[in-house]
Amino acid sequence: MRLLQGSFSMPNAHNRPHVFIVQADLPRLKTDAWLLPCDAGFHVLSSWIPQEYQAGLAQRNTDTYVLPVALFDEWTSGRRRTVRHNDWPGRSMPWLTNVGGGSKYEVAWYLEAVSQFVEEASTWAKAGLKRSRPLLGVPAVGTGFGGQWDKKAGVIDALFDHLVELGRLHDVDIVFTLFDPQSFAAAQLARKRRVEVGSFGWDLDSHLLASATALAERAKAGALVMFLGSGVSVGAGLPTWRDFLGRLADQAGLSDSELEALQNLDAMDAGSIVERYLGGREALEKSTRALLDTQECSLQHALIASIPHEAAVTLNYDTLYESASKVVVGDVAVLPQERNPRAKRWLLKLHGCVERGDLVLTRKDYLRFGERRSALAGIVQALLITKHMLFIGFGMTDPNFLRILDDVRRSLGDVSNEKDLSHPIGTVLMLNHDPLRNLLFDADLKMESMASAHAPDSARQLEIFLDLIAFRSASTTAFFFDSTYDALLSAREREFRDALQNLHQEFAEDRPENIWAEFEKLMAKNIKE
């Protein structure tokens, strides 16, 4: 095993704590615990509080709410700056943390608050541990209304270093969560500099390091599309397809023997049986909505959304991918219902959406799919032929998708005996080794197993793999025209930036029309990226 271009200073170590970086909405991200910024009076900005929770809170003003937490001596004196807030609607546990210091405080003051949070939250999270180690969420404290907004670069740079050390000290994983593309790019640049000097790396086997880097190159070239299976949503607390059927069957009152028989049926036939036991279509859809009722994305959703891509395909009914992507690119066009040519990303939902009442759950649904099924299959076939498809959380057992894959295989020419993987049409990320399944697809798809003797948690290895793709494909120039990130630019880079801005102003009134539009695009790309 080796680390990418740089590693932690500890030789021959494996399965170490990791700091992930995502562009995401932290209150909507599934973690074991997360830092909820507030001030000494427990005042919290409305952007941190889900709308379903705001109704019962007192408002300080139009943008700020007061959380119902009693003041205590250690808090008012400033000795303690973090406290668990149990009364929260989500599954992830927020810790109110006082980071509202204003401009009078230096960066170290914010880092101390983060230290208190990680120390207390890690101890609490380990008591009910479900992952191999706890996952804590931390935002870029101090860079908004916390008082250091004009020095974002220095805060983000110092905070990333601090999170790496805290993760090692308390044996926890941390997801550093940035809301806008500028701060996300700044965090990735901070990490890049640590990689270059050997103080940060990814604990992955060498073949996975190479595969993730190759996929990142495809993403940067606009050649990568995603295929999301139910495994992606498991980290958000949603069931796999097998568990989903099992829970529906429990609600329908099936016996253990009937449930066992149900699991052996084709998915659509199993759905038909459950529908009958539940009492009809309306009851089936109601139960489905209840089982998929969560507003928190998994870490995999956030990592996938942070990787550049324009299109994705899924059999999932939930809307978590859409929520995760909205933070990065705005609203996602969901096909086949929505046609939004302005959308920067679109998602093809082959089996419908829980919010639209068009779920494909039963054999009757599938048969009624009719001509639309053929049209949607054609879109998937085109993506497989023209792009490289990355399969995540998908077991490669769905008969409808396998039919699509077979059509593509035949259209490209059956090379099943040649075993030529120089140009695979896709990559499948698997949690475990499955040699027999590999034989079925190894002429068309690259099969990557996350299983490792050094890292027993394959799901966590998958997250680290996706984090590496996100890092290798991330822009590090999105903040170029934002002066609050000047600390990340060299003197020469700042000089070049200022010259571009002066040039833009100089010719704004008397534009050379034939090239001005392209120049505007260049400026806008780096401002909004």
Named regions from a protein language model:
Residues 5-16, 24, 164-226, 232-234, ...:
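SIR2/sirtuin-family catalytic core signature
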Residues 341-361:
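Class I SAM-dependent methyltransferase SAM-binding "motif I" and its flanking Rossmann-like core
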Residues 155-164, 210, 363-379, 404:
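Active-site glycine-rich loop that binds ribose-phosphate moieties when present
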Residues 46-50, 146-160, 238-241, 325, ...:
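Short Gly/Thr/Asp-enriched flexible loops that form oxyanion-binding sites at enzyme active sites
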Residues 99-202:
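Phosphate/ribose-phosphate-bearing ligand recognition and processing surfaces
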Residues 11, 26-27, 39-40, 44-46, ...:
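Metabolite-binding pocket within alpha/beta catalytic cores that recognizes anionic/polar moieties
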